[in-house]
Amino acid sequence: MTENEPSLVDSGEFTVRRTITIAASIEKVWAAITEATHVARWFGRSAVLDTVTVGSVGIFSFDGHGDFPVRIEECDPPRTIASRWGDGDPHAVDPLDPDRSTVFRFVLDVVDGGTQFRVVESGFGGLSDPAASMESHRGGWDAELDELVAYLNGGS
């Protein structure tokens, strides 16, 4: 199994990014990142997604962090999906306001031995504390994507 590098913060671009390799087919990875029953096994505590089309909305829930509304912004099966999500501010009038939320974009590519998975999360510049948010999400992507790898490689 390939050892995957940790996430990187780019404070100049206000992004967090990570690239990993998963020993699974692109179809299996696509299902794991787009079907709510699979998503809930590796990404937070629970996931609710209406459908996987641009404009669809849902909620991702995380222990200790609460519920985060999401809206699909881009979808090109089985290669790319991007979703906007709120920053968890319980007082936000519109939690998916483009000026107060971030977008995470997953891109999949077939490689020898499986699938390359890239995530880039952008939009931190509009949040109340961009540096703290980027660092928090960096750690989150490290943990969650490690869970995705374990899940797709036969973990629980």
PLM region descriptions:
Residues 11, 17-18, 37-71, 80:
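Short beta-edge strand/loop motif at the mouth of beta-sheet-based domains
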Residues 51, 150-156:
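Short, highly charged C-terminal tails/helix-capping segments
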Residues 92-142:
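Beta-strand/loop substructures that line and gate deep hydrophobic ligand-binding cavities in soluble
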Residues 29, 39, 58, 72, ...:
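Hydrophobic pocket/interface hotspot
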Residues 1-17:
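Short acidic N-proximal helix/loop "leader" segments that mark the beginning
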Residues 18-20, 68-74, 101-109:
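Hydrophobic/aromatic beta-strand elements that line small-molecule binding cavities or substrate pockets
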Residues 26-27, 73-80, 107-116:
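A short, structured loop/turn motif at beta-sheet edges
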Residues 23-42:
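Amphipathic alpha-helical segments
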